[in-house]
C-alpha cells in the first residue's frame, strides 16, 4: 500500500477511527490535568482551559465512537462481538458517557450561582482510567501493542 495514495488511506476500513480517536483522548486527559491544577493552584485560567479542552473532547468523542462502530461493521462485517473487541466497545461507550458527564458538570458550573462539585475530581480520575484502559485495548486491536 502506498502511504501517499489518498484513496487507500481515506477508504481503509478502520483508518478513520484510529486517526480520530486520539483527539478526544488527548483533550480529555489535558482537561483533567488542568482541572487538578486549577484546584491545586486556585487559578481560574486553568478552569477555563479545562472547560474548553473538555468541550472539544466531548464533541470530538461523537465521531470517534461513530467511526469505531463503522469500523466494526465494515471490517468485521458486523459479526458478533467477543473478547477484547467487545470489552473495547463497552469501555469506549463508558468512556464517552463519562466524558460527557464530566463536561455536563463543568457546563452547569459556568453559571454564576453554581460551583464545580468536589466529587468531580474522583470522577475525572475514574474517567481518565477508563479512557486509558479503553485506549490500551484499542492498541491491541490495532496491532500497536502486539507482543514482539
What are these regions (language model features)?
Residues 1-148:
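Polytopic transmembrane helical bundles with strong interfacial aromatic enrichment
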